Amino acid sequence: MRGGWGRFPPKSREVAAISGKHKPKLGQNFLVSEAACRSIVEALGNLGARTVVEIGPGKGAITELLANRAERLIAIELDRELAPRLRERFARRETVTVIEDDVLRVDLSALARPGEKLLVVGNLPYYMTSEILLHLIRHEAAIERAVVMVQREVADRVAAGPGSRDYGLLSVTAQLHARVEKLLTLPPGAFSPPPEVYSTVLRWTMHSRTDELGVDPTRFTGFLRSCFAQKRKTLGNNLRAAKYEPAAIAGAMQSAGVAAGVRAEELSLEALAALWRTLEDRS
C-alpha cells in the first residue's frame, strides 16, 4: 500500500492533543498517519465480538479507532504521563481498559476470556521489538493474530527466507510459531517525531508448526539458538561449541542430507527440524 499518509484519523485530534513530552528512552515515535492507522486496524479483521490488546497506544491515534470497533479493548502503556491521560480520555468507554505497565511484565494469556483468543496490535518501540515479539510467542496459545509496526530492517529479518542476508534466528523463531506477512512500509514522515528509519507493518497469524515438524518447542528453540550463535561459523562448528558430540553431529548431518560446511543461514526451517530430530535420535 502506498500514498495517502494523512495526519490524523477522524476524532483523534482530541487524542493527539494529549499532552506529554516525547521520551526518546521509551522509543516514542507517535503514528500520525490517518491511512496507516486505518490500514492497521483493518488488518486485524472483524473486531465486533473480540478482545483487542494494544501495545504502546501512545497518544491514542489507533486507540480511538479500536475503541469504536472492538467489543473490548485493553491498552498497555508504559509512559506514566500518557497512561493516566489515556485513561481519562476513555473514561466513559466501559469497553476500554488502560493498563500502566511494561508489556513484558503483563500476562497476556490472563487477559483473554475463557475460550477466547486475543487480537494484538501495536506500534512497537524499536529498542525492544525482539523482546516483545518473543513475548507474543510465549503467549501464542492465547493469541490469534498480531498486527505490529516495527523497524523495516527487523521486518525484513522476520520474514526472510534461507540464503538471504537477513535470514537468522529471529526468522526461524517467528516462522516456527506464525505465518508472517509484510503489509505496508511507512516513511519517517508518518510519525511524530519522525524516526531516522522506515517502518513496516507486519501481520502475524499465530500457527505453531512444532507438531507438524515433530519438534519439542523448548529443546528445538535451544537448538536453533546454538545453530545461529555465530553467523560466520559453519553449522557444525556452532553445534560443537554447544557441546554436541562431533561424531553425532557428523552422522546426523549426513543422515539429514546436510553438507558438512553449510551455515545455518542456508537451511530452511524444515531442514533444521530434520537435523534436530536426527540428533535427538542419536543422543
Swiss-Prot record:
Catalytic reaction list: adenosine(1518)/adenosine(1519) in 16S rRNA + 4 S-adenosyl-L-methionine = N(6)-dimethyladenosine(1518)/N(6)-dimethyladenosine(1519) in 16S rRNA + 4 S-adenosyl-L-homocysteine + 4 H(+)
Pfam family, one: RrnaAD
Enzyme class: transferase
The keyword ATP-binding belongs to this UniProt entry's keyword annotation: no
Gene3D superfamilies: Ribosomal RNA adenine dimethylase-like, domain 2, Vaccinia Virus protein VP39
Residue numbers binding S-adenosyl-L-methionine: N29, L31, G56, E77, D102, N123
InterPro entries: KsgA/Erm (IPR001737), rRNA_Ade_diMease-like_C (IPR023165), rRNA_Ade_Mease_Trfase_CS (IPR020596), rRNA_Ade_methylase_Trfase_N (IPR020598), rRNA_adenine_dimethylase (IPR011530), SAM-dependent_MTases_sf (IPR029063)
Enzyme Commission numbers on file: 2.1.1.182
Gene Ontology molecular function, alphabetical: 16S rRNA (adenine(1518)-N(6)/adenine(1519)-N(6))-dimethyltransferase activity; RNA binding
Taxonomic superkingdom: Bacteria
Localisation: Cytoplasm
Main localisation: cytoplasm
GO terms for cellular component: cytosol
SUPFAM superfamilies registered for this protein in UniProt: S-adenosyl-L-methionine-dependent methyltransferases (SSF53335)
Keywords of the record: Cytoplasm, Methyltransferase, RNA-binding, rRNA processing, S-adenosyl-L-methionine, Transferase
Free-text function comment from the UniProt entry: Specifically dimethylates two adjacent adenosines (A1518 and A1519) in the loop of a conserved hairpin near the 3'-end of 16S rRNA in the 30S particle. May play a critical role in biogenesis of 30S subunits.
Stated family: Belongs to the class I-like SAM-binding methyltransferase superfamily. rRNA adenine N(6)-methyltransferase family. RsmA subfamily.
Protein name: Ribosomal RNA small subunit methyltransferase A
Lineage, broadest ranks: Bacteria, Pseudomonadati, Acidobacteriota, Terriglobia, Terriglobales
